[in-house]
Regions:
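Conserved Nudix-box catalytic region and its N-terminal flanking loop in Nudix hydrolases
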Residues: 36-80
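Acidic, metal-coordinating catalytic segment for phosphate/diphosphate chemistry
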Residues: 2-32
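Unchanged
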Residues: 62-146, 178
Length: 182
């Protein structure tokens, strides 16, 4: 899904306002990442000082350091929070939350990590898309843009699911049983 501009001049992603028009040139304050493993998406419960965020799920990531580029900041945050090194990051878009510009990237990972830094995060879990929809409906998402970011990533960067086939793959060994002779 491509982003477009509403009649009010604000950018829309996944049908909702992402960054108000007057903030389009705002510097990036925080970075977040949609991590996808197969059909599941990683959400984290951050170690937050804000009472309203306790127990809520959000995308991994954090604040940029002085003069740090967004991609470098996200790579650093993913190592700090999850011990995860990622190579390929695609930019999904920017979202405005609590007076800060959050740049969101997406990445497919081959294995669902279960490790995290307890000083940074309280918990992590991998959710099906329908479960993320339910978390939003129940008010259990931290910033309110998690579902929009995941939706934008799914639509703009669909993962090709492997179809099961009965045909033999090139180079694969044949497994036909030999006929027994009487």
């Amino acid at each position: 899904m491509a982003s477009n501009t509403s009649e009010f001049g604000a950018v829309q992603i996944a049908g909702r306002l992402a960054v108000p028009a007057e903030r389009l040139d705002a510097p990036v304050d925080r970075v977040r990442c949609v991590l996808r493993c197969g059909k599941r998406y990683l959400l984290a419960q951050h170690n937050s000082r804000r009472r309203e965020n306790i127990g809520k799920w959000g995308l991994p990531g954090g604040r940029l350091k002085s003069r740090e580029e967004p991609r470098a900041a996200l790579r650093r945050e993913l190592i700090e929070e999850l011990g995860l090194r990622v190579q390929s990051l695609v930019e999904i878009g920017d979202w405005w939350h609590r007076g800060e510009n959050h740049r969101v990237f997406g990445c497919d990972v081959g294995q669902a990590t279960q490790s995290f830094a307890p000083d940074e995060l309280l918990a992590i879990d991998w959710f099906q898309y329908s479960e993320v929809v339910g978390l939003e409906a129940d008010g259990h998402l931290r910033t309110g843009f998690e579902l929009d970011a995941i939706t934008a990533f799914r639509v703009r960067f669909p993962r090709v699911e492997r179809a099961t086939s009965t045909r033999r793959r090139p180079g694969a060994a044949r497994t036909r049983a030999k006929r027994q002779r009487p």
